[in-house]
Swiss-Prot record:
Keyword Oxidoreductase tagged: yes
Protein name: Pyridoxine/pyridoxamine 5'-phosphate oxidase
GN (gene name): pdxH
Cofactor(s) needed for function: FMN
Job of this protein: Catalyzes the oxidation of either pyridoxine 5'-phosphate (PNP) or pyridoxamine 5'-phosphate (PMP) into pyridoxal 5'-phosphate (PLP).
A single MF term (Gene Ontology): pyridoxamine phosphate oxidase activity
Amino acid sequence: MKIDLTSLRHEFTQSGLNRADLSSNPFEQFKLWFQQAQEANVVEPSAMSLATSDDSEISIRVVLLKYFDRHGFVFFTNYNSKKSKQLQINPNVALLFPWLALERQIKISGYVKKVNTFESLKYFSSRPKASQLGAWASQQSSNLSSRQILLSQFESMKVKFSKGEVPLPDFWGGYRVIPSKIEFWQGRENRLHDRFIYQLSEDKWRIERLAP
């Protein structure tokens, strides 16, 4: 079966991006665009596609950015998940923020390091208790014969941790994506898009315009 989508076309007309408008610091530029995405009520602006790979396979999924600073971009996950197993083999990753409502996207390339236990505990403690229990209940990426098994595991965790605080699982925590390249893309008319890439070289960020 073939479905022809060639007639689907959207002209990008919202705005442009000039070199003079860019911060010399890519994290400051990301902060500005992220704030603008929030102000524009972009759905889940913190949602980002995370691409990982091992020796034989490339995988991609959506995860949530939890915070960022000049050191990198942090997300949390199960350390026994498929993504984590791939990261043990190959720490190089790519992120993509597709803010289509603003005709923008941000692409980030770099590598990951695990955050320390204190950072993981601080974030885990801020989560709703049901989410904490879910982290304990789910053996992420393992096979499930039915949803009922997952729900039963969740109920078991509710009983197990019915009193007191839910502890941080030793198989759960954060990764920090430390970027070497950050690209800002703004859609333009006639597919002549504006693209600027920040590349880290000798501890300094170099900015270049890219052809669309």
